[in-house]
């Protein structure tokens, strides 16, 4: 999932003050593991990972040290009698699919001809999960599974299964409100047809808005055709430096700062509101997190020092201010300081600083993993 940050002072503070299992993450398509950046929450985090890859789930279970993180080896899907499933009957799985022409697919085919088996990393990056040993084909409707497991509240739902993402999203049509889900990350594709059942970005966006969510982050990845392959971005076949926009990751959340959903917000606990702020912070939207904290200060203040939380968000904004109050005073009294610059030296310095913070945050996360009991 694109968009998460390595360094997040708000999550570090929350980890110190939290009750266990106060944040519920559900990761559908968890091959590669639960993103380590969520683990900054410490004991606040409780997570369920779901994936059909038998060997990958066995690997994740064997290496998992946190008893609050569990894994289910299964295909997530939608009930056959669900209205969306009925509507999709007889329609192609992928309309206008460009994948067979992409250099990523051709690369893997060439490796096969050389009798070289794709690694797990290559399968994940090039969406070759079909070549893995998979769970029984029986579908698990995830909202039903969560109910049977005694999970009555979910804070963040991630869906990335390289195909049936939109179907799985529809299986949550009632559960989005019943589970009080605060944020959703889902892989979207920008190719496809104009069919309302096609899992294209425009259909996902329409569905999410109809259920009270707004788009807060969107990444797009490029894939080149085999007619003129571009260099791969990473050390495994996948996205390329050039090419057509292909898939991306969209992050939706409850826009409780807008005032449009005050009735929904009135039913939320302080923990749910704080979890929404945490979602914004980890997706590098400290401004949206600050909006939640300031609007619902009274609801959240019983869980921790809201001013300390705001100071952490100001630090994430990286303005050089010593505190949230100083940051706001600067904007009030010297707004011109917030204007951008085209000076290449200034831009280079900012880029280096950003890169250093990203590197340092990753080192901190890796160190925590090594020291975990």
Report residues per predicted region.
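Membrane-proximal basic amphipathic "stem/tether" segments
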Residues: 1-19, 311-373
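Short internal loop-to-helix segment that lines adenine-nucleotide cofactor pockets
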Residues: 3-21, 109-179, 192-199
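SAM cofactor-binding core of SAM-dependent methyltransferases
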Residues: 6-92, 96-102, 107-115, 120, ...
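Conserved acidic-Pro-Pro-aromatic motif
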Residues: 23-24, 38-39, 44-49, 147-288, ...
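Short Gly/charged-rich anion-binding patches and loops
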Residues: 55, 141, 203
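Short, solvent-exposed helix-helix connector turns and helix-capping sites enriched
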Residues: 66, 284-286, 334, 362
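Short hydrophobic/aromatic-enriched beta-strand-loop microsegments
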Residues: 68-74, 180-184, 302-305
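Short, charge-rich amphipathic alpha-helical segments embedded
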Residues: 287, 291-324
């Amino acid at each position: 999932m694109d968009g998460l940050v390595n360094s997040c002072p708000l999550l570090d503070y929350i980890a110190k003050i939290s009750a266990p299992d106060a944040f519920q993450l559900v990761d559908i398509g968890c091959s590669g593991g639960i993103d380590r950046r969520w683990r900054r929450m410490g004991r606040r985090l409780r997570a369920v990972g779901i994936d059909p890859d038998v060997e990958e789930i066995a690997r994740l279970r064997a290496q998992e040290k946190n008893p609050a993180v569990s894994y289910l080896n299964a295909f997530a899907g939608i009930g056959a009698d669900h209205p969306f499933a009925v509507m999709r009957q007889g329609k192609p799985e992928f309309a206008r699919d460009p994948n067979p022409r992409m250099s990523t697919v051709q690369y893997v085919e060439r490796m096969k001809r050389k009798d070289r088996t794709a690694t797990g990393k290559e399968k994940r990056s090039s969406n070759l999960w079909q070549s893995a040993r998979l769970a029984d084909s029986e579908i698990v409707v995830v909202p039903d599974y969560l109910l049977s497991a005694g999970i009555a509240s979910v804070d963040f739902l991630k869906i990335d299964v390289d195909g049936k993402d939109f179907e799985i999203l529809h299986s949550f049509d009632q559960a989005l409100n019943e589970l009080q889900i605060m944020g959703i990350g889902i892989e979207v594709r920008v190719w496809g047809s104009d069919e309302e059942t096609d899992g294209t970005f425009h259909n996902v966006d329409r569905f999410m808005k109809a259920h009270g969510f707004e788009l807060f982050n969107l990444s797009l990845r490029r894939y080149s055709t085999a007619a003129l392959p571009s260099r791969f971005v990473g050390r495994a076949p996948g996205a390329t430096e050039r090419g057509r926009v292909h898939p991306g990751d969209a992050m939706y959340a409850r826009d409780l700062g807008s005032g449009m959903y005050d009735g929904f917000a009135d039913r939320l606990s302080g923990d749910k509101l704080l979890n929404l702020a945490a979602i914004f912070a980890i997706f590098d939207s400290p401004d949206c997190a600050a909006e939640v904290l300031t609007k619902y200060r009274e609801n959240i203040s019983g869980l921790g020092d809201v001013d300390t939380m705001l100071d952490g968000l100001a630090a994430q904004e990286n303005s050089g201010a010593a505190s949230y109050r100083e940051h706001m005073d600067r904007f009030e009294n010297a707004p011109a300081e917030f204007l951008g610059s085209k000076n290449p030296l200034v831009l280079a310095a900012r880029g280096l600083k950003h890169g250093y913070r990203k590197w340092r945050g990753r080192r901190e996360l890796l160190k925590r993993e090594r020291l975990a009991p």
